[in-house]
């Protein structure tokens, strides 16, 4: 059964989850043209190829939590969502 605190505060589930993994790239085996493997695609992929760090940070002080989610759009815009959660 789910933890009552998680049901009451569904965002708390984010504290224990890892970010989704990016899709794996398919390996093209048996291609006769080796140069085609090393060519850069003309379009930018819609998902990152690797995630160096989690897209969110969690700070905890006494009874309060701060969850910050930072993402970048394809157009280069940075979006930051910051949630201040406090236990009453």
Swiss-Prot record:
Pfam families with a match to the protein in the record: Pap_E4
Keyword Phosphoprotein: yes
GO cellular component: host cell cytoplasm; host cell nucleus
Post-translational modification, as annotated: Phosphorylated by host ERK. The phosphorylation triggers a structural change that enhances keratin binding and protein stability.
InterPro entries: Papilloma_E4 (IPR003861)
Region Disordered: start-end pairs: 14-54
Keyword Lyase attributed: no
Keywords, in A-Z order: Early protein, Host cytoplasm, Host G2/M cell cycle arrest by virus, Host nucleus, Host-virus interaction, Modulation of host cell cycle by virus, Phosphoprotein
Listed GO biological process terms: symbiont-mediated arrest of host cell cycle during G2/M transition
Domain of life where this protein originates: Viruses
Biased composition (Low complexity): 39-53
Role description: Contributes to multiple aspects of the viral life cycle including viral genome amplification, suppression of suprabasal cell differentiation and egress of newly formed virions. Induces host cell cycle arrest at the G2 phase by associating with and preventing the nuclear entry of host CDK1/cyclin B1 complexes. Inhibits cellular DNA replication by preventing loading of host replication licensing proteins MCM2 and MCM7 onto chromatin. Within the cytoplasm, associates with host kinase SRPK1, a splicing factor regulator, and inhibits its activity.
Family: Belongs to the papillomaviridae E4 protein family.
Oligomeric form and interacting partners: Assembles into oligomeric complexes. Interacts with host CDK1. Interacts with host SRPK1; this interaction may favor expression of late viral transcripts. Interacts with host cytokeratin components KRT8 and KRT18.
Extra remark: The major E4 form is first synthesized as an E1^E4 fusion protein from spliced E1^E4 transcripts, such that the first few amino acids of the E4 protein are derived from the N terminus of E1.
Official protein name in the record: Protein E4
Organism ancestry: Viruses, Monodnaviria, Shotokuvirae, Cossaviricota, Papovaviricetes
């Amino acid at each position: 059964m789910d933890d009552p605190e998680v049901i009451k505060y569904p965002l708390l589930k984010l504290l224990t989850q890892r970010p989704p993994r990016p899709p794996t790239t398919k390996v093209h085996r048996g291609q006769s043209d080796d140069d085609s493997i090393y060519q850069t695609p003309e379009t930018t992929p819609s998902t990152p190829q690797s995630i160096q760090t989690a897209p969110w940070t969690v700070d905890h002080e006494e009874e309060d939590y701060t969850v910050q989610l930072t993402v970048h759009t394809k157009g280069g815009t940075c979006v930051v969502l910051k949630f201040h959660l406090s236990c009453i």
